[in-house]
Amino acid sequence: IKKYNEILKESYYSSTLPIKNNLTESQVAKFIATKYKYPDVHLKHKFSRYYPKLKSGAHFIGHINRINKKDIKRLKKLGIFETYNGLDHIGKTGIEYFYEDKLHGLPGYKKIEVDAQNNVIRTIESVDPVHGKDIILNIDYKIQKIAEQAFVGYKGAMVALDPNNGEIIAYLSQPSYDPNLFTNGIDETSWKKLNNSIHKPLINRVVSGLYPPGSTI
């Protein structure tokens, strides 16, 4: 209940409250069989961000999370709040945050007429969504993995550039974290573990760490 109350506080503008994500086929079948008991609960197909590389590159890729009041205030100030109607998530850190306006696209919608039993009678209006743009980075994943392996057991930061053009081909902040934890709102236990860790995995040491310069030659 505490979790849902927190979601309600942050998502007061949304018309829906997610109870559970990523249902299995068995869970879907069980719900459908007993749906008559829960007239106000509905199944909904939904796209979800998944980071297949897990901790690898988490600090430059960043992550998304549920839209909160602070995000809404910023979106309204920028005059783009309307483009987020029907959306629940937004980029919070890294590339996800910096290129949010290009990644999120535009939501579609459908206006329908229903009867007293909530059965669809007809579609009044339908607008297809517009997909966000793809972003291709210059990161060389082989070099990225070599850097990560070299930093196992250590804390620090590393950036590798292509000397021919200055492109960033590896970007490492160690230790790292799994951005998938944040996608649908991080749970309290996981948050405390990350936030209270003496190793500070959430800090992007490339841009926020303070280190002596050492030799520049």
Question: For each predicted feature, which ranges?
Answer:
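Short hydrophobic alpha-helical segments used for membrane anchoring or interfacial signaling
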Residues: 158-163
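Active-site rim segments in enzyme catalytic domains, especially the processed small/beta chain
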Residues: 212-216
